Design a protein with these regions (language model features):
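Membrane-proximal helix-turn-helix segments that form the acceptor-binding/catalytic region
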Residues: 123-126, 130-134, 160-182
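Nucleotide-sugar-dependent
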Residues: 246, 290-301, 306-327, 332-345
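N-terminal subdomain of nucleotide-sugar transferases
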Residues: 1-70
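Conserved donor-binding/catalytic core segment of Leloir-type glycosyltransferases
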Residues: 230-246, 252-256, 264
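Carbohydrate-associated surface elements
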Residues: 186, 209
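A short, well-ordered alpha-helix in the C-terminal region of glycosyltransferases
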Residues: 363, 370, 377-391, 401
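Nucleotide-activated donor-binding/catalytic signature segment of Leloir-type glycosyltransferases, i.e.
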Residues: 264, 273-297
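A short helix/loop element that forms part of the nucleotide-sugar donor recognition site in Leloir-type
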Residues: 57-64, 216-229
Length: 413
């Protein structure tokens, strides 16, 4: 029996290595794992911009940059970033501009066996479909967060005309795709409810993962801790986007109730300025910007307890990928998120942390008090989480799932 020929795949994504966005880390590893399986991959992405919301030094000067790799190619285009993260219109126009330019760039290169397009931004659905029309490979639409649901839930989008357009774009993108991949059963139910019954079998769950060789448990006494002026006291850490989807007011309330601990918010986003102003009278709260990728394991090791807070309703439309990274670092998770959704299920299965209802300061602080009171138990949670993630979130397994999905689309299954 002869082996099937290697696949030729086009990948359209808003971030790719060396960009530091979590979704960029995920898709970069998937691409490298697909290449390790012998496949040819051609990536169309943005110039690196995520950390400061501006194109990184050394990458400017051209709207389109192309490079050949051992496994295919990378085409990077201008993402039209805006430094004002609170200006939603400016950000939306940037997404549209990036989607259009990446779409034009993706039309080069001949026929492929599949087009994998990653959302958000939701506009990549139409970009992927246009690429499919020219390059003939079936469209696989990968959903990291369900949009516009998350934006509507948080009140980031309230204009009914904008919501109607976004819903239309979402519906069209799902129906044009040969397959839609989501991260959890909750997201599958959400997407399946928006497509016709005959198309629901096209929605597949392929979870995210973490690089457990890169992120490993390490000593809590890190240089990062020293840089922030923190001693040996317990550190409660939030790392990630500082936006309106995250209930970061819980962090400040906990800081008021637990002056013996230091609370670190590591990241940036539209809500950081207001959150930092609100924390001005809290001496046990530290803020720091995104760190380079190579420092991520060190940042994670700094925290004794890590936080995953999402506002009510968002646990059903989003699976924070940071949860996998925290577990890989051997640290316990305290999640404030909708019960019965993917993160609480993950923590229950792994023993790697606890979950409380969202937006409930008393429940949040009660759970944190228990974790702070028993360092030995929190260390055991961290070890259990690491053990679970080693077996449940393999990059190679995720790449094989995409390979099998594309093979199935080729054969009409």
């Amino acid at each position: 029996m002869t082996s099937p020929r290697p696949l030729r795949i086009a990948v359209l994504c808003p971030h790719f290595d060396p960009d530091t966005a979590p979704t960029g880390v995920v898709i970069s590893r998937i691409v490298h794992e697909l290449a390790a399986l012998g496949h040819e991959v051609h990536v169309v992405t943005a110039l690196p911009w995520y950390r400061e919301h501006r194109i990184e030094p050394g990458w400017g000067g051209k709207w389109v940059q192309r490079e050949r790799t051992e496994w295919g190619s990378i085409t990077r285009v201008n993402p039209f970033p805006g430094t004002d993260k609170r200006n939603l219109l400016r950000r939306a126009l940037g997404f549209v501009g990036f989607s259009a330019l990446s779409g034009l760039a993706s039309l080069r290169g001949g026929r492929v066996d599949a087009v994998i397009a990653m959302s958000p931004p939701l506009t990549m659905g139409l970009t992927g479909w246009c690429t499919h029309l020219v390059r003939r490979g079936p469209l696989v639409f990968n959903i990291q967060d369900v949009f516009p649901d998350a934006a509507v839930e948080t009140g980031a989008i309230t204009n009914r005309h904008v919501i109607r357009i976004a819903r239309w774009l979402e519906r069209v993108s799902y129906h044009r795709a040969a397959a839609v991949t989501v991260l959890s059963d909750d997201l599958r139910d959400n997407v399946a409810a928006k497509v016709s019954a005959s198309r629901r079998s096209r929605v597949h769950v392929i979870p995210n993962f973490v690089d457990t060789e890169f992120i490993v448990p390490a000593d809590r006494r890190t240089p990062f801790r020293h840089e922030l002026g923190i001693g040996d006291e317990p550190v409660v850490l939030y790392a990630g986007n500082v936006g309106f989807s995250q209930s970061l007011g819980l962090v400040l309330e906990a800081a008021r109730r637990f002056p013996e601990a230091t609370f670190v918010v590591n990241g940036d986003g539209a809500a950081r300025a207001s959150l930092q102003a609100e924390a001005a009278d809290l001496p046990n709260v530290r803020f720091s910007g995104y760190q380079p990728k190579e420092r991520v394991p060190e940042v994670l090791a700094t925290g004794d307890i890590h936080l995953v807070p999402l506002k009510q309703g968002l646990g059903r439309v989003s699976v924070p990928s940071k949860t996998y990274s925290i577990l890989a670092a051997g640290r316990p998770v305290l999640a404030a998120i909708d019960p019965g959704t993917e993160v609480p299920r993950m923590l229950a299965a792994s023993g790697g942390g606890v979950a409380v209802p969202p937006d409930d300061p008393d429940a949040f602080c009660a759970a944190l008090a228990e974790l702070l009171a028993d360092p030995a138990d929190t260390a055991a949670m961290g070890a259990a989480g690491r053990e679970w993630v080693l077996g449940a979130a393999s990059p190679a397994a995720v790449a094989r799932a995409y390979e099998q999905l594309v093979r199935g689309l080729q054969s009409g299954r």
